[in-house]
């Protein structure tokens, strides 16, 4: 996997390559693997499995052969069954595998083309060093800055409506008191009283 991408850009985003293989009568299996020396994390996301134009009108079954793990009784898993007259191509969604991965043509003569996306993520341990450096800088800044006094709590301003209502009430009270002072006391029967029965 030779690349002209700089080391810093690899850390920013993963390297993504188009990948593909062919299974046929001569090559019934294919193993996708990466070198042991490569420290990057690799994933293979399958996209399509399709028949070639020379494929016979028969069923072609493609399966993934799980790795032999001690004490495991894993069997091959079929991922596509294709036939030129019925289904010449299958789109794969959500099949992301970690290498090594072995594909096998269980039945049929092919050719079958498997394609996908090979993503390589370089292990990035520089973040730990950067965080340590940032913490030291923050500690130095805290030591240099004296503690700032607490900020006073602001009271919310009274709303305009409340102020206007209060102003109107005060004006009304003033008018009533001025009317009482200006007008002489009324004489006669009391207002609002019921007349007494004779």
Swiss-Prot record:
Listed PANTHER family: NUCLEOPLASMIN, NUCLEOPLASMIN-2
Classification via InterPro entries: Nucleoplasmin (IPR004301), Nucleoplasmin_core_dom (IPR024057), Nucleoplasmin_core_dom_sf (IPR036824)
Tissue: Mainly expressed in oocytes.
Region annotated Disordered, chain positions: 126-198
Region feature Acidic tract A1, mapped onto this chain: 35-38
Site location (Interaction between pentamers): 57, 83
Chain residue ranges for the region called Acidic tract A2: 129-147
Keyword Zinc tagged: no
One GO CC annotation: nucleolus
Chain ranges for the short sequence motif Bipartite nuclear localization signal as given in the UniProt record: 154-169
SUPFAM superfamilies linked to this entry: Nucleoplasmin-like core domain
Biased composition (Acidic residues): 127-147, 173-182
Main location group: nucleus
Name of the protein described by the UniProt record: Nucleoplasmin
Location of the region described as Acidic tract A3 in the Swiss-Prot/TrEMBL record: 174-176
GO molecular function, one term: chromatin binding
Higher taxonomy: Eukaryota, Metazoa, Chordata, Craniata, Vertebrata
Keywords associated with the record: Chaperone, Chromatin regulator, Developmental protein, Fertilization, Nucleus
Subcellular location per the Swiss-Prot or TrEMBL entry: Nucleus
Species the sequence originates in: Aquarana catesbeiana (American bullfrog)
Family in the record: Belongs to the nucleoplasmin family.
Subunit annotation: Homopentamer.
GO biological process, one term: chromatin remodeling
